[in-house]
């Protein structure tokens, strides 16, 4: 595995204050089940995950979501530069439509939503880091 494609401990939000500092800001984007927050830090990109029992009661589901999110972030980590990104599950998955904790439809749903959300977040980072466009001078 290449070193830059790894997901080391330094690339994760670990402490409560790190999560709190990102949560204080408004959410950037939402999907049907997830919300993403971001905060510039100037250091390397880090990911925080909040996958609570309230919205994913089964441990297998929570672990599946975490694995998919970590992999998606790991592949896009360079796009986030010096930003902390926090991904939060905010809605339950429909048990009738997705009865198994790790069914292929649930896996596909999570992957598509998380990848779409991280793509939007990467565009947001690019937009916020871009220098402001100068207004044309009129004399």
Swiss-Prot record:
Annotated source species: Paraburkholderia xenovorans (strain LB400)
Family designation: Belongs to the RnpA family.
Record-level GO BP terms: tRNA 5'-leader removal
EC number assigned by the record: 3.1.26.5
Disulfide bonds: none
InterPro entries per UniProt: Ribosomal_Su5_D2-typ_SF (IPR020568), Ribsml_uS5_D2-typ_fold_subgr (IPR014721), RNase_P (IPR000100), RNase_P_CS (IPR020539)
Catalytic activity: Endonucleolytic cleavage of RNA, removing 5'-extranucleotides from tRNA precursor
Functional summary from the UniProt entry: RNaseP catalyzes the removal of the 5'-leader sequence from pre-tRNA to produce the mature 5'-terminus. It can also cleave other RNA substrates such as 4.5S RNA. The protein component plays an auxiliary but essential role in vivo by binding to the 5'-leader sequence and broadening the substrate specificity of the ribozyme.
GO molecular function, one term: tRNA binding
UniProt keywords, alphabetically: Endonuclease, Hydrolase, Nuclease, RNA-binding, tRNA processing
Subunit annotation: Consists of a catalytic RNA component (M1 or rnpB) and a protein subunit.
Lineage: Bacteria, Pseudomonadati, Pseudomonadota, Betaproteobacteria, Burkholderiales
Family matches, as NCBIfam families: rnpA
UniProt protein name: Ribonuclease P protein component
Keyword Ion transport: no
Domain of life from the UniProt record: Bacteria
One GO CC term on file: ribonuclease P complex
Leading EC class: hydrolase
PROSITE patterns for the chain: RIBONUCLEASE_P
Gene3D superfamilies according to UniProt: 3.30.230.10
């Amino acid at each position: 595995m290449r070193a830059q494609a790894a997901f080391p401990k330094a690339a994760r939000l670990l402490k409560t204050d790190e999560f709190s500092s990102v949560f204080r800001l408004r959410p950037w984007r939402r999907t049907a089940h997830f919300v993403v927050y971001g905060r510039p830090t100037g250091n390397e990109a880090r990911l925080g995950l909040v996958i609570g029992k309230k919205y994913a009661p089964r441990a297998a589901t929570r672990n599946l979501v975490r694995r998919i999110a970590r992999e998606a972030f790991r592949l896009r980590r360079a796009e986030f530069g010096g930003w902390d990104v926090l991904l939060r599950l905010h809605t339950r998955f429909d048990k009738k439509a997705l009865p198994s904790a790790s069914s292929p439809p649930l896996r596909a749903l999570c992957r598509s939503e998380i990848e779409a959300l991280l793509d939007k977040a990467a565009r947001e980072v690019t937009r916020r880091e871009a220098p402001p466009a100068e207004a044309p001078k009129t004399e």
